Design a protein with these regions (language model features):
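A generic structural signal for ordered secondary structure
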Residues: 69, 112-113
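Short, solvent-exposed loop/turn segments that connect beta-strands within catalytic domains
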Residues: 105-107
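Short beta-strand segments
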Residues: 7-8, 82-84, 114
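Mixed-charge interfacial surface used for oligomerization/domain docking
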Residues: 2-3, 11-19, 23-28, 33, ...
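Class I S-adenosyl-L-methionine
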Residues: 34-103
Length: 256
């Protein structure tokens, strides 16, 4: 009997699955004084509060090849899922680990999916892989089915703060501060190339959530599964769920 495993970097918002062996390779956030490892033991609230107060710089670090090999374990067939290669080196590290694993373990196979996305969309992709495994599909058929599924999924997002982006040098600290003072939210989507593309700058959380719901329709969503991810904002996630349920029929929504 083949031993099957799903492995993902920790951007996926999951740490366990119901029916399939699953493991994450942790992302990290590093400052001059501290290192945060994104695993099941991470105090997310404590980390977020620390980074919000941080005056210095921070940087993120993707799993390295050794991290991926450790996560692979000794499975016969591995389905590996990474955050978009447009934002991180996670995919390249996973591909390097795949080459080493398959070279050292004859007959064992790894497929690496570059999601070209982040967060909740990765969750949907992982759940699709598990669904295919439950149907006892072959390795090749699972790869084909999930690749086709990824062409039908998408990501839209809302950011209330640009503080972390300022800390790691992606945006000007002045811009981040002005956005916060003005109460502006950034609403955008994951592009086909795997970058995060800002589209709207509504003022106020409620208007931003309404804009986000409108983006779903603009991106062609009509019915099906939606995964909502959030950081320290469960109330906004619940409001978004209500807005979506009011606008669309035949929708199944999970909040992570």
């Amino acid at each position: 009997m083949r031993k099957i495993k799903i492995v993902a970097d920790s951007s996926c918002d999951l740490f366990e699955l119901t029916h399939t062996e699953f493991e994450t390779a942790p992302m990290k956030i590093i400052t001059a004084e501290r290192e945060f490892v994104d695993d099941a033991n991470l105090d997310v609230d404590g980390m977020a509060d620390y980074l919000y107060q941080l005056k210095g710089k921070s940087k993120s670090s993707c799993p390295n090849t050794t991290d991926w090999l450790d996560a692979f374990g000794d499975a016969d067939e591995i389905f590996c899922v990474t955050i978009t290669s447009g934002l991180s080196g996670s995919y390249n590290s996973a591909c390097a680990a795949k080459q080493i694993y398959e070279a050292e373990k004859e007959g064992k196979r790894v497929h690496v999916f570059d999601t070209l996305s982040a967060g909740p969309e990765i969750t949907l992709i992982i759940e699709k892989i598990e669904e295919c495994i439950d149907k006892d599909m072959s390795f090749e058929d699972i790869c084909d089915c999930v690749t086709a599924y990824m062409k039908k999924t998408g990501l839209v997002f809302m950011l209330k703060s640009l503080k972390t982006f300022a800390n790691n040098g992606r945006v000007s600290p002045i811009v981040a501060k002005l956005v916060g003072i003005a109460g502006i939210c950034i609403v955008g989507k994951a592009s086909d190339e795997g970058t995060l593309e800002p589209m709207h700058k509504p003022r106020g959380e409620r208007r931003a959530l309404e804009t986000l719901t409108g983006c779903l329709e603009a991106e062609g969503f009509k019915f099906g599964r939606i995964s909502i991810g959030h950081c320290q904002n469960e109330s906004a996630a619940e409001q978004l769920k209500e807005l979506i349920l009011a606008k669309f029929k035949n929708v199944s929504i999970e909040i992570h």
